[in-house]
């Protein structure tokens, strides 16, 4: 059923622009004739909003809770069709502080598989929260669903820290589940030497920076209208960037087992590029009373 489908996943730190980047890229892939389904695996349920021009799609778990069981749902109730025929599903999650979102993800995926949602597709894309690759959010990797992982990051310290953590999670399941890292997507924050830094990080993680997405306010303008840039401004420079990334993913054959860094290695890299200051830079104030350093 899923033998010829490429099952990819976008992971990344919360707030990095993962859902925005993935939807814009998948919209460009759909423009190129690829048949795509998005499965949102983020409790915020915002993985399909730009495709559907909606606030948030009703989730599999929410409807299942209303009906009593996931078996009582019809596929058409949870799978909607968006921009360029992209199929859209949100797995949803439990109320904050209650239960495991990962269990909801696998429940939703199993329901989709059992009801024929994976037929006539070229790509299935999982959009996954990724500050921490806990057992729950690692579910698409752990269960062998997502085979090809793209990490959305930037030149900021916490985004790189999360990328390294996600690489560690991929490594854990690379041999048992066959999952591979497809590359880093740098969603620019206009950090100094950002492209060079992420290229260096990619090399250390045994992968590639598959694309550098420049920062452009047109992305926010499109988001306010609940649209992808490709639909809102198809001739813009930014839409061309997403099309370039889409082509690279479609043609990507560099799928690797990552080599995550130790924390001191990552910090040394950040110091080298001036993201994290060396203590010597502030030697005149470190360890002094507050009133002395304020003078």
UniProtKB/Swiss-Prot annotation:
EC number: 1.18.6.1
Keywords for the protein's UniProt record, in alphabetical order: 4Fe-4S, ADP-ribosylation, ATP-binding, Iron, Iron-sulfur, Metal-binding, Nitrogen fixation, Nucleotide-binding, Oxidoreductase
Known catalytic reactions: N2 + 8 reduced [2Fe-2S]-[ferredoxin] + 16 ATP + 16 H2O = H2 + 8 oxidized [2Fe-2S]-[ferredoxin] + 2 NH4(+) + 16 ADP + 16 phosphate + 6 H(+)
Modifications after synthesis and translation: The reversible ADP-ribosylation of Arg-103 inactivates the nitrogenase reductase and regulates nitrogenase activity.
Manner of cofactor binding, per the entry note: Binds 1 [4Fe-4S] cluster per dimer.
Binding sites annotated in the UniProt record for ATP: 12-19
Annotated positions binding [4Fe-4S] cluster: 100, 134
GO biological process: nitrogen fixation
GO molecular function: 4 iron, 4 sulfur cluster binding; ATP binding; metal ion binding; nitrogenase activity
Residues where ADP-ribosylarginine is found: 103
PROSITE patterns in the cross-refs: NIFH_FRXC_1, NIFH_FRXC_2, NIFH_FRXC_3
Cofactor: [4Fe-4S] cluster
Quaternary structure (record): Homodimer.
Alphabetized NCBIfam families for the sequence: nifH
Entry's family note: Belongs to the NifH/BchL/ChlL family.
Function field: The key enzymatic reactions in nitrogen fixation are catalyzed by the nitrogenase complex, which has 2 components: the iron protein and the molybdenum-iron protein.
PANTHER family to which the protein is assigned, alphabetical: LIGHT-INDEPENDENT PROTOCHLOROPHYLLIDE REDUCTASE IRON-SULFUR ATP-BINDING PROTEIN
Protein name as it appears in the record: Nitrogenase iron protein 1
Organism expressing this protein natively: Mastigocladus laminosus
UniProt gene name: nifH1
